[in-house]
């Protein structure tokens, strides 16, 4: 059973554990969440039956041209790669829904997308660490309602 802190967030380390967690908690839908370049949350929801171990490696396709400032229509295919360490049950949805925060990658090369805020943050942390400027970074996440 995944560890559950008091604030209802779950730390899950493997895709198998996520799938087991979904079965144990009768999850019906999976909300794949990501941010646009300015930090606005976006998401796509899929039935839990579409979530497999392969999803965590292969990702779920979406149209990047629908996001402000991302891709042209002729280069719009992108992939959402769910990150298991950020899953939690949605406390507000009546339908049992698991939320997964995703990284965004190129569907051909599987390289991180340069405008993904999570990738930008990872690059910043790596730079701070490699230059000795800092050994930790803290980010404030604002959710637009």
In which residue ranges do the predicted regions lie?
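ATP/Mg2+-dependent ligation/transfer catalytic cores
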Residues: 2-142
